[in-house]
Amino acid sequence: MTKLKFFLLLLTWAMTSNAQDSLPKKLSLTEIVVKGKKPPVSFKIDRQVFRAAEYANAANGNAIDLIKNLPSVSVNGQGEINLRGSASFQVLINGRPTQGDPAFVLAQIPASSIENIEMISSPGAAFDADGKSGVINIITKTAPEKGLMVQSNIMLGAPPFNDFDNQRYTSPQRHAADISVGYQKGKLDLSSGFNYLRNDMAGYREGDVNTTIGNIFTSFPSNGERSFKRYNFGGRLSAGLQLDSRNRLEAALYSGKKYQTRVADLLYNNSRKNMLTGAQSSFDYFNKNTAEKQGVFTLASLGSSHQLSKATQLSFSLQYEGADLESLTTNQNLSYPGLKQMIQETINPSTNPLHAYRFKADLTDKKGSRTWQAGYQFRYDEQTGDFLYKYRNAGSFEFTKDPFFSSQVTVRNNIHAGYLQYGHAKGRLSYQAGLRAEQMLRNLSFSDNVPGNRLPLLNLFPSYLIRYALAEKVAIKQSFTRRIKRTNNFELNPFPEREHSETLEQGDPALLPELTGIWELGVEHKLSKGSFTMSLYHQRTKNPIQRVNKVFNDTILGRIFTNAGLAKQTGVEANLTYRVGKVWQMIIGGNIYKYDIRGTLFNGSLPFTNNSWVYSINATQGFSLRENWSLQLGINYLSLRATAQGEDGAFFTPNFSVKKTTKDNRWNFQAQWLFMDAGLGISNIQRITTRGSNFYTTTNYVYEPDQVQLSVGFNLIKKNRKISLPQSEMAEKEF
């Protein structure tokens, strides 16, 4: 009997050690401490959920450093974020939609404050129709039930190993600090945090441009410094109050500032040749260019939910989003050598604030396995851009306004939307289908008596998703959704804006929004020690917005926003997570697609076609060693990608980290080696090429490799419960 009791006790211990999530939630134990690890990726009917803690290489960074590791996300050398090859996607913060530029919004969120990232590639009718490639929902950390959470990090970057012998920005600085605090007790739930990040980057640029106007061939290759000084800081506060068993209030406030100065000090070798006579002339000049941008981002929301009955819930939310954006571009052309004579100087100050308001009402009725959802949303946003261009030539002391490059543009959008969605789950089959109707009115007005533009649109956005479990751990799903990419101030502004010495940008007030239909077929397979997902998708985009080039004069190219025909994209996305033994955790994701675009440019005068295969690979290999040491190697690779008039070159960034965690999990110490290169000249480099019948331009951007960072983190989670049973993949499945 004693042996039997011992055996049963041993068996019970083994079961709680290896399958603790099978224990009932209400089991009260006081002397057992259970350890477990959540899976890196989990699934819901309409989304994949990625654990932020799996990506140690993103520590001390922001949300961009995290999401670039997801299978369908890529970030190029210019910092542009693409989801399935498109920069048009919507960012949610804890389910609250944002309207600003995704890169600007994500840069305000410290990576250490993020719990999960939800990827929704086929959003239903209950979601906004914005974002043609889907939705990314950032879930931030909160306090445990009836407990306290305190988490902080401090980072210090090492001096640069390669500053390219730059003359202006000689000492890039990198340091960061953040703190998050959460508290939950009774009916009250509070979370707050503050973060600061300074993340300069040295860089170098080499380019070549040539134009042909009549018989004159002009070439102006250039090279020189292209560095960044940048920082951002912000605070966040959210509160939830359970008034009673049926009613709850929630409020949240996010506010942050982002600042960036980009310097481009370039030596130009300008030469002209008459193709008929052979006559040539040349001269050199030095272009000193500084682009300063800053903005304050604010997101405030107030919401309530009301349980009308056991099956019916009504919720309301009111949200304000503001972005006070300012910029100043200074451009000086100096004689070379010597740099003593000013040939021309221009300044280009601008303000472009965004104010957006949103009201939502949602009704959910759930009876058994059937769920009805209906809702209404009103959106109003206004963006007023004031773009000023002044110049002075040699010998002049006063700046003169140039009306050709100066403008005021105001865009106002009124959007009324309603939706109806039905969902049903029975046995192995679950599905949802819905329809969203949207009435939009875009009003565009300009300064200087330029006629405005009024665009009313009525669009329907149908969607459906079907998921069927072939077996206990294997499911297939098929979906369709229709999405929209709206236009912004820069894309609509018909006045040319002088970006720097060799380029200007110009919009089109008649520009139409992009409309995209997305078909998807996927499979989810839960493995014994991981998971595998694969999705085949096809996108058709009507009125794709392209930024194309044409010659403005012999030394300036004009970048013009225009609708360009029809774009199609067919691809496969896959992600594998697998644990090999107790040491090795691998996460390998990738996306490969064929992009095909064809149509006409410049009012039908120039037919074009271009296509290419594009692929990206994001891989993370983690190793858990003895005494709480861990290593992680991450690789992000983006292949060459075709554009309307050229191609964007490949981009490769490997990263490595070493981490030591104390036994009580209170402290961690980490060293990071970012943009690993070791003198090979292959990391953090990208070439952009564009060509036309009478011009050619190519630019190679070389950014600082081999960045080293050291950090210390503190983590305290205090729970007022005697035992906590962490969720596992099995428990998530049952839930």
Language model segments and positions:
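Extracytoplasmic loops and strand-loop junctions of Gram-negative outer membrane beta-barrel proteins
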Residues: 119-120, 153-155, 160-164, 217-223, ...
